C-alpha cells in the first residue's frame, strides 16, 4: 500500500543500524484490494482486477488473507507509467498476514453498559479482549456484565473475551491503574494466544474505524512498533508530579479513597530519564513481554518508583520504553486517539459531542475519547463510520449474514481471515503514513 512498504523497510533498517541516511525508494507496495468491480471491462488492468477478485476474494466481497508474510510489491524495471507493466502475476498471493490485537477495556461504577457497547464496536473473532469493572462498581453490575459475556454464543464460540471477575481496586491517578493494566497484559500473555499489539482503552473510548480497517493497515507494519505519545520535556510536571511523593491507599486498603501527599519531596531521578505522555497506547507484544517478565530489572525498578508518582499511567510505560535500549527505537509518537483538550490541558479532556464529528473524522485517528454514556454522537459514529446496528457487533468480512430488515450480518459467521476494509482504512493509512514520515518518525522518538 502507498508508501507503507518503503517505511516498513526504512523502520527495519533503522532498528538494525542507528545511523542511516534517509532515501526514498521507488518500491510501491500494493494495498489489499478495495473491492469495486472495474468499470472499463475492455482494459487489461480491469481484466486483471477481475481475475484477482474472482480468485482471491470470498463470495461476500472481502479479501482472503493468504499464508504469506510479505506485502505484494508492484515492482518493475523501466519507466512505464502504466501499472500493468509493473505487476508480477506470481506475486498476487503475497499478502501480508493479518495481525491480532489484544484489548483491555476498563470501567468503573455505572460503566457496564458503555463498556459492553465499546466491546461490541471493537469485536473481531481473531482478537483477544480483557474487560474489567473496578471494585467501585456494584457486584450486581459486574455480574450483569459477566453474565452477558458468558451467555453470548459468539463469545463462547471463539473464547476470546475474558472478564476479570475478582475486581481490582483502582484509584484514579494512582499506580493501581498501572497495576490493573499490567494485570490484564499478564492474563493475555498467560492465555498464550497469538496477538501482536496490546491496546488499553476505557469504557469512555470509542473506535472511529472498523477492526477490518485497523487489521488491513497494521498488517503492513512491523510488529514491534510501539504507538505511545511521549516527551521528556516534563515542564511543570517536574514540580507537581515528579518531586511530590504520593501514597495510593488502593495498594493496601479494601475501601477506595483518594491518593494523598506526604510532606517530604524527592529529587528528579538520575538512574533513568523521566518521560510523560498519554495514558492510552498500543504496545507491541515484545515490549509487553519485557514489562511483565522483567528479565532486565528496569521495568521492575521503574514500577516501584512510580508507585509514589501522581498520574503514573501517564509516565510508567513511557519511561520504561525510552530508557530500554532494545525498545527506544521502536516508538511512534502517537496515542492513536482524537482527544479534545483545553490549551493548556486540564486534568480532564472535553466530552466529545455531535459538534466534534467532523474534527474526529478529519483527525484520521482510529480511536477517540472522552464520550458521555449513550451520547448521540456514538449513534452517528455507528451509522456513518462503523455501519453498526443498535446492540450489534461492528460487521466485518467474517460476517456473511443479511443486513435486510435490521438483521445482524454477524449472526452468520464466515471465514474469520477475510477482511473488508472501508473508508476508515484510507484515513488510517494517511495517519500512519504521516507518523512514519521522515519528519515525524525518528525525529520524535524519545526526545
Swiss-Prot record:
- GO MF entry, a single one: glucuronosyltransferase activity
Q: Which residues lie on this side of the membrane: Cytoplasmic?
A: 1-33
Q: Which InterPro entries match?
A: GLCAT14A/B/C (IPR044610), Glyco_trans_14 (IPR003406)
This protein's major location comes to Golgi
Membrane topology listed for this record? Single-pass type II membrane protein
Where is the protein found, in the record's own terms? Golgi apparatus membrane
Q: Which residues are sugar-modified?
A: 151, 200, 329, 405
Q: Which UniProt keywords apply?
A: Glycoprotein, Glycosyltransferase, Golgi apparatus, Membrane, Signal-anchor, Transferase, Transmembrane, Transmembrane helix
A GO term from the CC aspect: Golgi apparatus
Q: Which Pfam families match?
A: Branch
Summarize the record's disruption phenotype note. Increased cell elongation in hypocotyls and roots from seedlings grown in the dark.
Q: Which residues lie on this side of the membrane: Lumenal?
A: 55-447
Q: Which family does it belong to?
A: Belongs to the glycosyltransferase 14 family.
Q: What does this protein do?
A: Beta-glucuronosyltransferase involved in the biosynthesis of type II arabinogalactan (AG). Modifies both the beta-1,6-linked galactan and beta-1,3-linked galactan present in type II AG. Transfers glucuronate to beta-1,6-galactooligosaccharides with degrees of polymerization ranging from 3 to 11. Transfers glucuronate to beta-1,3-galactooligosaccharides with degrees of polymerization ranging from 5 to 7. The addition of glucuronate at the O6 position may terminate galactose chain extension. Required for cell elongation during seedling growth.
Designated name of the protein: Beta-glucuronosyltransferase GlcAT14A
Q: Which organism is it from?
A: Arabidopsis thaliana
Amino acid at each position: 500500500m502507498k508508501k507503507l512498504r518503503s517505511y516498513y523497510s526504512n523502520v527495519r533498517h533503522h532498528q538494525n543500524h542507528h545511523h542511516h541516511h534517509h532515501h526514498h525508494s521507488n518500491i510501491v507496495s500494493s494495498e489489499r484490494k478495495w473491492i469495486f468491480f472495474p468499470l472499463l471491462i475492455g482494459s487489461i488492468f480491469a481484466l486483471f482486477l477481475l481475475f484477482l477478485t474472482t480468485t482471491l476474494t470470498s463470495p461476500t466481497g472481502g479479501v482472503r488473507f493468504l499464508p504469506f508474510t510479505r506485502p505484494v510489491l508492484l515492482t518493475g524495471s523501466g519507466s512505464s507509467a502504466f501499472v500493468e507493466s509493473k505487476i508480477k502475476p506470481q506475486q498476487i498471493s503475497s499478502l501480508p498476514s493479518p495481525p491480532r490485537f489484544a484489548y483491555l477495556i476498563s470501567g468503573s461504577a455505572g460503566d457496564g453498559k458503555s463498556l459492553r457497547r465499546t466491546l461490541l464496536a471493537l469485536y473481531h473473532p481473531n482478537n483477544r479482549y480483557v474487560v474489567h469493572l473496578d471494585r467501585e462498581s456494584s457486584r450486581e453490575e459486574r455480574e450483569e456484565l459477566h453474565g452477558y459475556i458468558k451467555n453470548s454464543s459468539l463469545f463462547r464460540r471463539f473464547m476470546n473475551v475474558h472478564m476479570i471477575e475478582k475486581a481490582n481496586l483502582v484509584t484514579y491517578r494512582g499506580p493501581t491503574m498501572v497495576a490493573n493494566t499490567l494485570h490484564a497484559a499478564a492474563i493475555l500473555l498467560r492465555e498464550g494466544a497469538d496477538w501482536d499489539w496490546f491496546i488499553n482503552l476505557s469504557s469512555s473510548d470509542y473506535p472511529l474505524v472498523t477492526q477490518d480497517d485497523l487489521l488491513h493497515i497494521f498488517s503492513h507494519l512491523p510488529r514491534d512498533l510501539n504507538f505511545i505519545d511521549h516527551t521528556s520535556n516534563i515542564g511543570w510536571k517536574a514540580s507537581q508530579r515528579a518531586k511530590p511523593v504520593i501514597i495510593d491507599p488502593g495498594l493496601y486498603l479494601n475501601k477506595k479513597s483518594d491518593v494523598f501527599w506526604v510532606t517530604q519531596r524527592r529529587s528528579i531521578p538520575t538512574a533513568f530519564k523521566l518521560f510523560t505522555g498519554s495514558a492510552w497506547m498500543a504496545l507491541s507484544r515484545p515490549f509487553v513481554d519485557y514489562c511483565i517478565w522483567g528479565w532486565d530489572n528496569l521495568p521492575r525498578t521503574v514500577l516501584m518508583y512510580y508507585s509514589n508518582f501522581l498520574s503514573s499511567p501517564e509516565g510508567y510505560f513511557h519511561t520504561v520504553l525510552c530508557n530500554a535500549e532494545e525498545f527506544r527505537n521502536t516508538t511512534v509518537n502517537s496515542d492513536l486517539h482524537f482527544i479534545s483538550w483545553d490549551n493548556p490541558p486540564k486534568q480532564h479532556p472535553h466530552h466529545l459531542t455531535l459538534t466534534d464529528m467532523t474534527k474526529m473524522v478529519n483527525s484520521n485517528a482510529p480511536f477517540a475519547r472522552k464520550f458521555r454514556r449513550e451520547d448521540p454522537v456514538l449513534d452517528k459514529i455507528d451509522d456513518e463510520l462503523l455501519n453498526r446496528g443498535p446492540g450489534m457487533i461492528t460487521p466485518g468480512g467474517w460476517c456473511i449474514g443479511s443486513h435486510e430488515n435490521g438483521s445482524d450480518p454477524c449472526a452468520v459467521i464466515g471465514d474469520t481471515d477475510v477482511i473488508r476494509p472501508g473508508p476508515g482504512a484510507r484515513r488510517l493509512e494517511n495517519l500512519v503514513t504521516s507518523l512514519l514520515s521522515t519528519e515525524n518518525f525518528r525525529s520524535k522518538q524519545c526526545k
